[in-house]
Amino acid sequence: GTSTAPEELKRINLDLIFAIGGDGTTLRAFRIIPCKVPLFSINIGGNRGILAEAGIDSIDDAIHSILTGHYFYDSRLRIQASVDGTTTPAALNDFLFTRINLTRTPTMSLRFMNDEMKERMDGILISTPTGSTGHSFSVGSPIMHESLNCLMISPIASVNRMPQIIIPNEEIEIKSNHDANLIIDGQEVLRVIAGQSVTISRFYPDAQFIRIHKKGMRQLAKLGF
C-alpha cells in the first residue's frame, strides 16, 4: 500500500476520513486533516472509544450505512491557543496549562469576560464540551452536553480550592509567573515562558463527525452511565 504524509493531506481533495484506532487517533486526525473534511471514527483499541461511532465488529454495517446515505453530521466546537502571536493547532478536547517546576507552585492569572482571577495552583485545564468526558472529567468537572457553546475552566490543585467554572465561549487569557507547558489534547507540548500570555479562543470551522446512530448524550453512554 501507499502512505501519505500528514502535511500532504491538506492538499488533497477528500470527501471523508476514517480514523481507525482509539480516541487518541481521532484527536490527532482532526489536527492534520483539512478543516472541513468530516471524519468517521472506528475504535479498535482496548479503551472505551468515547469519540468513536463504530467498533471492530460493526465496521461492515457502518460502511454500508455511509454508502447508502444513512448518516448525519455531528458538529463539535474546537478551540485554539495563541502564544505571543503564534497560533497552535486546534484542540477538540482541551488545553492544559501546567507548571514545569515541581518544587514551586506558580501564581496563575485567568482573564475572561472582563474579569481577572489570580490563584496559586499547579495548572488550568480549558475544555470543550467534547473534552468534558476526558481529562476534565478525571479532575472532577461535570460533563457537558456535546452541543453546548461553552467552555469549562478546571483549576488543577488550586491552593484555595478555586471552583470549576463554565463560561460562554469567550476568549480566555492565561499567564503564569513561572515557565509552563501548554499541552494540546494531551498530545503536543508547547513551552510557555514566565509572563507570556496564552489566549484561548474558538477555532473555525467546527470538527465534523459522521454519525449513523442518533443518541442523546453519546459520550455519557460510553462512560457506562
What kind of feature is each model-predicted range?
Residues 28-30, 50-51, 107, 136-138, ...:
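Short glycine-/acidic-enriched loop or helix-start segments at secondary-structure transitions
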